[in-house]
């Protein structure tokens, strides 16, 4: 008798995506992050839903409502810290997922890669708006500084900023609309993630060797479900350790002070996962130039498939390309560190050097390394 999962239309869909899905037999733990990102998204939606039940999106009560959730709501403290630190875990998985795509050449699956970039933008927008909601000092001033960047747009900049703010400054209207978008975007992200999977299953997964997986495939269940569950346990171990032992480790102490438009914090900075882009923004003395550099630091991912001139898909057997890749990783870590430092010597200079190196590595060094390797292998 044919199992129900192969006959029922809905079960058949799940079966083809998660159970009988043909997967390459040699994919490593770096392929775990897709399922971990899905888990993070579900966790964020569930915890966010419970937080929204008690949160008040109003400038006069937002800060107090967050304190109320932490103090008075049953297990409110753990829901809040799971949501805040869950976002950090989300971005860690996201960066590792993109890093794996770059290293093993998964960007050659264009539709999947491009939807992934849209997903990254949507996730960054959601996280930014979520950071504004507690209405602490860093929430308020972070929102003011980042939204103010729109004023760099020629001619319509000022109108654009006031349109986003809903007034002449970040105020109640801004908070209300940010809460609205913060609530709706995760569902849009879920739809995009489904499309991401749909396009991935059209081509099948890449593998570490960067060769065709067609001759040697195994079913996703039980082999990779077990492997993914191990990754999930490790993720939950790190997340719960953070939540239970150091819930405020990745946050900013200034956010425990209620938003005050008359008092600017000594050093305004976004959450840690935006610091690399923030460092690039600050490295350009011109406002419009800084905004363009900020946008290009993410949009450059769109150009990666075009810049791929190597004859091999994966970097596994390309030592020169590996060198440029790890240079890029080190550079991004340096930018993240610089983004959290005050705007003074020597941090300004280090930030500028690291910003130039970031674009140089992707646009010049990586393609040159690939061409040299092609030449050495007589594949030109």
Curated annotation (Swiss-Prot):
Keywords: Electron transport, Heme, Iron, Membrane, Metal-binding, Mitochondrion, Mitochondrion inner membrane, Respiratory chain, Transmembrane, Transmembrane helix, Transport, Ubiquinone
GO cellular component term of the entry, any: mitochondrial inner membrane
Topology class, membrane: Multi-pass membrane protein
Any one of the GO BP annotations: mitochondrial electron transport, ubiquinol to cytochrome c
Molecular function terms, GO-annotated: metal ion binding; ubiquinol-cytochrome-c reductase activity
Residues the record lists as binding a ubiquinone: 201
Binding annotation for heme b b562: 83, 182
Cofactor (UniProt): heme b
PROSITE patterns, per database record: CYTB_CTER, CYTB_NTER
Entry's cofactor comment: Binds 2 heme b groups non-covalently.
Annotated Pfam families: Cytochrom_B_C, Cytochrome_B
Biological role stated in the UniProt entry: Component of the ubiquinol-cytochrome c reductase complex (complex III or cytochrome b-c1 complex) that is part of the mitochondrial respiratory chain. The b-c1 complex mediates electron transfer from ubiquinol to cytochrome c. Contributes to the generation of a proton gradient across the mitochondrial membrane that is then used for ATP synthesis.
Misc: Heme 1 (or BL or b562) is low-potential and absorbs at about 562 nm, and heme 2 (or BH or b566) is high-potential and absorbs at about 566 nm.
Subunit structure: The cytochrome bc1 complex contains 11 subunits: 3 respiratory subunits (MT-CYB, CYC1 and UQCRFS1), 2 core proteins (UQCRC1 and UQCRC2) and 6 low-molecular weight proteins (UQCRH/QCR6, UQCRB/QCR7, UQCRQ/QCR8, UQCR10/QCR9, UQCR11/QCR10 and a cleavage product of UQCRFS1). This cytochrome bc1 complex then forms a dimer.
Membership in a protein family: Belongs to the cytochrome b family.
Entry protein name: Cytochrome b
Lineage, highest ranks first: Eukaryota, Metazoa, Chordata, Craniata, Vertebrata
